[in-house]
């Protein structure tokens, strides 16, 4: 295995893993309602929603970034409770926490755990998207 095949490049270039050329890497969320979930992530990423019957793809500058698939029986995680634990979450590292917080709240997020210390590199705040999937805004410099 070559050094190139063992590492993943950034989104700007091809992604090689064990000789496999991956054109796009997309996180997919299940949701009982596609519109609020895809609209939320399109707003967060400043992208557009490509709509199909039971699938929405959020693209940014024409590149697929997040998928939302219809899951009529989707039950939101109940974080931090363990009755319905999270299975995946995104960490979004932001330079301007107050602006990012205002944006995700306006798009329909809700706070699950407030930051203890809203200073750069010190903390993070946990939110849920409209379908209940946890994600974090991580404060950086």
Language-model features: where?
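Extreme N-terminal basic, low-complexity initiation segments
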Residues: 1-9
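N-terminal beta-strand motif that seeds the catalytic metal site of vicinal oxygen chelate
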Residues: 9-38, 44, 88-92, 138-141
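Core segments of cupin and vicinal oxygen chelate
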Residues: 19-21, 28-71, 106, 112-122
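Vicinal oxygen chelate
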Residues: 32-34, 85, 90-130
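Active-site beta-strand termini and strand-to-loop segments that position acidic
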Residues: 58-62, 127-130, 140
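Short connector loops at helix/strand junctions that flank enzyme active sites
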Residues: 61-63, 83-87
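A short, acidic/glycine-rich surface segment
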Residues: 73-79
